[in-house]
């Protein structure tokens, strides 16, 4: 794994390895339908008798708070009332990239454990239609639990994404979020066991799985629709290489821009087909984002 990181990131591998050994901060996503990020961090500071400056700061991604030191869930005000969720800042960016002022028919693919599903519901109008799909029944229950805490009721489809006929109603999606299964090499600081469990051969297997899902879902996207392809991987084989192979098969793929605020984008690394957040940059986990739009 280290050799592969060195190969893919010859100018950044040292900072990647250092960041993977550091303690990760605690990121929160505030529910904008219930409270603002500023008011919520004030509430945490007050209830935990900590100064706001020592507690953390408002993140650059919308409705985010980064705590310098993790605190117990029971110490998070109104957590069980759906005011806030625990979700890394980079993961929050995926939904920002997806919605960006648009709505309509939305698909959250590979939806478990439901963080992004909840974030979508917190940021769309009632007329939008969200479909969430997950192949693992046990992980689908996690989505139900997360949404129940946030005050939402949503039927989760338990299906294989590649078996399109088993779950798709033939109505095209305007927006698709594909948070693809991956090596999780960008979140090692949160899950250090990955360093010992993941093998280089796993990367090729993930590449094939990611490409298959991407090809399957493309047929369900409307003309002029937007798909955000996301992984928490650092490896080109799971990121740009997947998009490159995908483009060879489809001639109706256009690259959309990630319409994020400039302070975030200037800290991301522009790749051939997307953007990479390296672990530790902006205090976030390592994530890759590519915006794909279907040509009319």
Residue ranges of predicted features:
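S-adenosylmethionine
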Residues: 1-296
């Amino acid at each position: 794994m280290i050799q592969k990181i060195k190969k893919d990131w010859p100018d950044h591998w040292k900072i990647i390895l250092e960041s993977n050994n550091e303690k990760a901060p605690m990121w929160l996503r505030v529910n904008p339908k219930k409270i603002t990020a500023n008011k919520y961090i004030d509430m945490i500071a007050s209830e935990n008798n900590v100064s706001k400056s020592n507690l953390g700061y408002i993140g650059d991604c919308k409705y985010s708070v980064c705590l310098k030191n993790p605190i117990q869930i029971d110490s998070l005000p109104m957590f069980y009332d759906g005011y806030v969720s625990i979700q890394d800042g980079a993961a929050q960016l995926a939904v920002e990239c997806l919605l960006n002022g648009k709505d309509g028919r939305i698909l959250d693919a590979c939806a478990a454990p439901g963080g992004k599903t909840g974030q979508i519901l917190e940021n769309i109008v009632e007329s939008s239609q969200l479909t969430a799909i997950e192949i693992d029944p046990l992980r689908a229950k996690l989505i139900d639990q997360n949404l129940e805490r946030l005050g939402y009721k949503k039927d989760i489809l338990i299906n294989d994404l590649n078996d399109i006929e088993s779950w798709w109603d033939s109505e095209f999606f305007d927006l698709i979020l594909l948070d693809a299964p991956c090596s999780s090499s960008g979140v090692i600081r949160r899950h250090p066991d990955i360093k010992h469990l993941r093998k280089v051969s796993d990367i090729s297997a993930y590449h094939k799985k990611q490409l298959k899902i991407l090809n399957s879902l493309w047929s369900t996207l409307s003309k002029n629709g937007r798909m955000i392809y996301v992984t928490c991987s650092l490896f080109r084989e799971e990121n740009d290489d997947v998009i490159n192979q995908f483009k060879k098969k489809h001639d109706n793929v256009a690259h959309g821009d990630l319409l994020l605020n400039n302070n975030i984008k200037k800290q991301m690394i522009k790749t051939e087909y997307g953007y990479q957040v390296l672990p530790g940059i902006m205090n976030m986990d390592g994530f890759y984002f590519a915006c794909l739009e279907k040509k009319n």
